């Protein structure tokens, strides 16, 4: 990523979730790409291309629990090399390699310049407005159900 980042004009990312504050949850490696671009091509823009329904009412994506995906997905990909590596490093079963299988990471809103969706180009203020509107609508629809439970 770093070798290619110095000559870019734009970093174009998708989004799995967009928070009210403009933070984006996207695939692992997205934040690294943004940081490389900011360091090596400071004039490059970071643009999120996504559907507007990815905008959520949460103000911060950090409130979500850390992913706990199956670590054996990674170990299986390495096959026998995994066991060999553990043996070569002389690690026993109780002190084996720690494996985290994380699919998503957060790119903070301060690193994002604009958002593009089916309704057009959105600023961070536009994202905030959409999120607030969704929160109001959710309360109108589901608020009475909260009182029942």
Question: What are these model-predicted stretches?
Answer:
Residues 1-149:
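Conserved phosphate- and dinucleotide-binding cores of soluble alpha/beta proteins
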